[in-house]
Amino acid sequence: MTEIHRAEHARRTEFLGREFLTWMMARSARDRESFKLPSGETFDVVFERAVTLDGQNPAKDRSLLKVDEPTESEEVRLSLRLGKQVSVARVNLIHDGREFHLTILAADLGLRGIRLPEMEGDDPDAAMPFRMDLCDQVEALVQGLFLSFIRLRLDPEAWKREVASIGRWVDNLPIPDSEDEAT
């Protein structure tokens, strides 16, 4: 694929990253941070202090918000009501008692600034394989989340219900219990 085709492909699909991060934030708030992967594994996603939201023209219509709890923030919800979507999110993934702090970029689903859990023990020969395994775990968690999102996004009826649920969350309205379906 030539550079021009790659750039055009990235431009055409970038909206999926923003929809994914916005969905992930709404689901994190709705389901009290708990996610279930297609494999059946569960883990928590906690949005941390900084979140960036972009409108249709990110060069002119961008909000960088630093709030204690982004999923509960009225400023974040107002930006979403104004048509913005999450474009950069700092998150904490909690899986099997381990915490992974990282930033996810919507443009390319890039993972940045990953902070891994500390290794137990002092064996320097074991450190690198251990850290590589942790990086693989982080990548697998985010890929699993994205796969769940894409499956939902490709099902017109399920996506319609999910968009309605996200809208109720954005408007701070109660969400009926029947919508607590895992994806």
Positions of predicted regions on the chain:
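Intrinsically disordered, low-complexity, charge-rich terminal extensions
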Residues: M1-T183
